């Protein structure tokens, strides 16, 4: 490619290929991205040495082997037909919680490489992401990875791709991303089998905001896909969703190193910076246009990310509250889908009520807070958004059981339901179905693909957020995979269960549960609390109650001083008098004594499977 072209940053649109890699967690997506970068010279072998998953920039992404933020890289490739091509590779997350990151990355591309592990076969999240790619009219090239493993069964997996997804896999590319085997064939398949983007260079600027993140030096960096027109340095742009205008300071792309250019043309993917203060000002999926002659219609199909799961996060040490507030603010800079507001709890002090996209999102935020900011946190039981109709005709939404109005004021409570797709080897099907049944699920369909079963279930989200994923993995020995999407709200017989310690309700342990499961959950929680609350000088009753009705109770026995030790022989009334006096003292203590509940008791009670 000529220096002139490289400087301008624009390329003939027919020589551009925008594609994403779609795969289930751990099927080798980021490793394949590494090989593509290496073989096209994006980074030298020396720079790649000792580095795996170049595009996974967070430590936690590398450690868990998952991709959280969508990443992009631009590669130059000299094809066998003698032409120079530009590849824009979008590395997307594979986990269900980050499905919105996937959807907008896919909207910026025309094709996808579907990477399937030849030893594992198609998994539930592969399905979800492929369907999203097909919804975006993507051309799909199947790639079978890990074909060098002894357990690989490429022919069986090809058949499975055709049966489950319904796309022709006869000419799937066979590779081993780890060793680089077959990767040159992938590069050629991108050129020959994926379509170039469409776009008009002379039209008014129209660009899709794909992602944004905060950089300490540059402020907010915005990842864009140019649809029509040209994005130039020093031009003035407008975000159509927020109606805010900015002056573009830098324009460029990643190779994965940052390269600045003067302009980006139609079909290209790159970044801009424009003195934007907060990531919250850049809505993902928004349309960017020219401020001087704006277009009227936004690009279709994007909605803001809405939190689905909520929980309270409290610092173990109350002095860490300000540090936690600052840390959350910093994480929110890079993650607009994470929301939080302050809350107080009588048991845990000051903390925050946080909203997440799902359980993995919650876990990752929690882990980042403890790892990057060295914070020790307690998380309360995760809950979902409930809709309540009141007797006076009003409607409210709550996600914190503490905010629930008096029972007499509530006409009905509705909870969110999901449709779950579970793929499991048929040996474990029985225990998977039993688990879904226990969680109030209703089966929609059951089909077999080879030796694996695909089950669709309707389940209440409330039953899934708690520990469903862990239980599913344990009943299937880790082989089942799971994907879900929200469907609608259904009215349910839900009750607010409280845990009382020494007659006092512990607000952090309140939860909304289905009436049929309340007793089991309550009993399990009080038994756990009994094990972990140390004995005091007086006995402590631990109760689980619904309204005024106690449904389970355990008692922590009192420590007792032997007050009669000094009485040798003598009259029995002397002993009795001392024992009566002790009894009086205990009674008084129980009335005014404060019970110290250790942090472990909270954490263990919340993890109980009732």
UniProtKB/Swiss-Prot annotation:
It comes from the Bacteria. Keywords: Cell inner membrane, Cell membrane, GTP-binding, Hydrolase, Membrane, Nucleotide-binding, Protein biosynthesis. One of its GO terms (cellular component) is plasma membrane. This is Elongation factor 4. It is an enzyme of class 3 (hydrolase). Its main location: membrane. GTP binds at residues 26-31, 145-148. It comes from Nitrobacter hamburgensis (strain DSM 10229 / NCIMB 13809 / X14). Residues 14-198 form the tr-type G domain. The keyword Metal-binding does not apply. Required for accurate and efficient protein synthesis under certain stress conditions. May act as a fidelity factor of the translation reaction, by catalyzing a one-codon backward translocation of tRNAs on improperly translocated ribosomes. Back-translocation proceeds from a post-translocation (POST) complex to a pre-translocation (PRE) complex, thus giving elongation factor G a second chance to translocate the tRNAs correctly. Binds to ribosomes in a GTP-dependent manner. The keyword Cell inner membrane applies.
